[in-house]
Amino acid sequence: MPKLKTNRGAAKRFKRTASGKFKHAQSHHNHILTKKSSKRKRNLRPLAVVSAADGPRLDRMLPYA
């Protein structure tokens, strides 16, 4: 059986946690930040967990994560 290919776009965006879930950075926190409140930017800082419905899809895209 051939090696499975990793989806490189997904590999750059998602990391697997120790419990097997995936985490990712939140959107809207890259540019055009001056008009956004400090509270909004602060709340966008922590990594978010991928929903359970999308987990199996990421398992296929990142077979070695």
Curated annotation (Swiss-Prot):
Keyword match Ribonucleoprotein: yes
UniProt record, GO biological process: translation
Annotated region described as Disordered, given as residue ranges: 1-50
Molecular-function GO term, any one: structural constituent of ribosome
This protein's UniProt keywords: Ribonucleoprotein, Ribosomal protein
GO cellular component terms given for this protein: cytosolic large ribosomal subunit
Basic residues compositional bias, start-end: 10-44
InterPro entries for the chain: Ribosomal_bL35 (IPR001706), Ribosomal_bL35-like (IPR021137), Ribosomal_bL35_CS (IPR018265), Ribosomal_bL35_sf (IPR037229)
Family: Belongs to the bacterial ribosomal protein bL35 family.
The protein's name: Large ribosomal subunit protein bL35
The species this protein was found in: Nitrosococcus oceani (strain ATCC 19707 / BCRC 17464 / JCM 30415 / NCIMB 11848 / C-107)
Lineage: Bacteria, Pseudomonadati, Pseudomonadota, Gammaproteobacteria, Chromatiales
